[in-house]
Amino acid sequence: MHGFHDVFIQILLLLAISVTVIAIAKLLKEPDSVALVLVGLVLGLTQLPFIEEAESYITQSEVFQATVISLFLPILLGDATLKLPFHHLFSQKKTVMGLAFLGTFISSLTIGAASYFLLDLPLAVAFTFAALMSATDPISVLSIFKSLGVKQKMSTIMEGESLFNDGIAVVLFKIASIYLLTYIEMGWAGLGSGVFMFLKFAVGGALVGLILGYVFSQVIRVYDDYPLEVAFSALLFFGSYFIAEHFHTSGVIAVVVGGFVFGDYGAKIGMSEETKTNLNTFWDSVTLLANALIFLMVGLEIRNIDLAGNWGYIVGAIAIVLVGRTIAVYIGTGWIKELSSKERILINWGGLRGSLSIALALSLPMDFDGREQVLLLTFSVVLFSLIVQGLTLKPVIKKLGLA
């Protein structure tokens, strides 16, 4: 290592590669997230001296986890809340809540039980893996929807589900990886403790987001200065996340709630049209760069994963996750008459997993029993999801006649 300067230059090279890949993918009208993962895989499997140090640096567990969770996640969640009008979300509230709450719990239980009995994973490992697989990533899905002219209804459902189930999945992950075995030993008292822990994370995070969202909404009433208001939005996203985490509640839920309050209530009382336009433009650019690096980093992680001799194990995990998603979608939305069978099929196949799952897996302590198993299975499922499901989503949409 020749110092920070050399690593920084090499990371800029990776960013240049990422942006170039996005530009080419857009010309070819293919999902840029899939293209970035594939290029990352190629870079991770080859030795290129001019970016070797940067690859080694950003694929370290601590760096990847900190970059995705602490830096990029608040940005992506906050931007999504600004882009998703609350009245659109409210119009699909039954479907979004059915998927994000009921569906996420069903998915976690199904995948956890199947992994325990069929893959013979230890109980805590099985349900930790299940929690990771319950978080969905709609980034590539939404870009495909937009390019094909899929109804706004479907984009709202997919994005709304992801915003809420990410927060729930993170809470379930913490409970499964840290407290599950203790709660089981406690019996019924453990069940009560688990429910209390979940409510503490979820409600506490929501309160932090609600308070900060309201405070920043009042602050921007005083100003008509869009650079300053953009800065306030950044403070809200990162402040919500880290304050909630400091008080051991859900930072993800805090950002989502705070972002919705700021983007809906704050926009009504304190943003001019110029501010709204510039706010969206700024975060569009930032999220493009963030996603570019995230998906390239996912591909680069191949250098740290040993797939050899584990193919049966991997195929079993992929099958379990696909079945778990199907069960969750059909039970979670089975009571909703407004949703057609074709739309359910699309929601099912479009439930891609992404970088959050890998980042959370990398955050597991080194002494966590089964850490390598969780990393192997999580990485494999995410790769399958982004590449196979991502590349087949467009033909599926056309076949269903939803374009």
Curated annotation (Swiss-Prot):
**pH note:** Optimum pH is 8.0 for sodium and lithium transport. Exhibits Na(+)/H(+) and Li(+)/H(+) antiporter activity between pH 6.5 and 9.5.
- What's one GO BP annotation on this UniProt entry? regulation of intracellular pH
Q: Which InterPro entries match?
A: Cation/H_exchanger_CPA1 (IPR018422), Cation/H_exchanger_TM (IPR006153)
GO cellular component annotations, sorted alphabetically?
plasma membrane
Pfam families given in the database record? Na_H_Exchanger (PF00999)
Transmembrane feature ranges: 7-27, 34-54, 99-119, 125-145, 168-188, 196-216, 228-245, 250-272, 282-302, 311-331, 345-365, 373-393
Give UniProt keywords alphabetically: Antiport, Cell membrane, Ion transport, Membrane, Sodium, Sodium transport, Transmembrane, Transmembrane helix, Transport
Which cell locations does it reside in?
Answer: Cell membrane
Record membrane topology:
Multi-pass membrane protein
Using the UniProt record, give the first listed, main subcellular location.
membrane
A GO molecular-function descriptor: potassium:proton antiporter activity
Q: What does this protein do?
A: Na(+)/H(+) antiporter that extrudes sodium in exchange for external protons. Can also transport lithium.
What does the similarity note say? Belongs to the monovalent cation:proton antiporter 1 (CPA1) transporter (TC 2.A.36) family.
Task: Give the protein's recorded name.
Answer: Na(+)/H(+) antiporter NhaH
Q: Which organism is it from?
A: Halobacillus aidingensis
